[in-house]
Amino acid sequence: MYIGRIVAFGMTKDGRPCAMYRVSSRSFPNRRAVENQGKIAIVPREGAEGDLAKNPYISYNCLRIAGEWAIATNGSQTDPITEKIAMGMPVRDAITLSLLALDYEKDSLDTPRVVAVVGRESKKGFLGIVRKDAVLVREFDLVPGQARYISTYECNSPADEYVDNDFDAACENCAVQYVVNGGVFANIENPVTSAAAIATDDGFALGTLIC
């Protein structure tokens, strides 16, 4: 099954919140997640820089931290959402305003923008999407051993059924692996790269994986 880019949040079985992002792509598979100065960006792999001329949407910050919140998205919405949350705006409003302002991507597929935000202290998670036909944002309570997700295609609403009830990750490297081939994600096709932030005692630890 191919469902495009995936954002997810969850809580490990020992109670640590986690945000995850996975690039699944048919058209532009030559990408990688790179950590730099406390954030993670999606960039072309060496030798594939020319892909940016074909599609400007394929490179962006995909994961950032704002205080107690970890923000994962599939596009340039990462930055305004993070900045609004850092300025004190409620998470729901920061997601909604940023998605409305940027709208869906104006590529050949009208690709939706998706967002997952998780709180280290609040024990809350949010999923959001802007599609050509809708803007949807929803808040969830975190549950140990559970991850929720939304994707650009197919699983493209913050619905109860898009859930993994056996989620666990011992560390950030385990989280990036899980969103590629763990639980419900194992049967999703065309993994390219992934990123994750998992809560620690004093913040979040970041991890990346190239498939």
What is the predicted role of each segment?
Residues 1-211:
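Conserved short alpha-helical segments that host acidic/polar catalytic motifs at enzyme active sites
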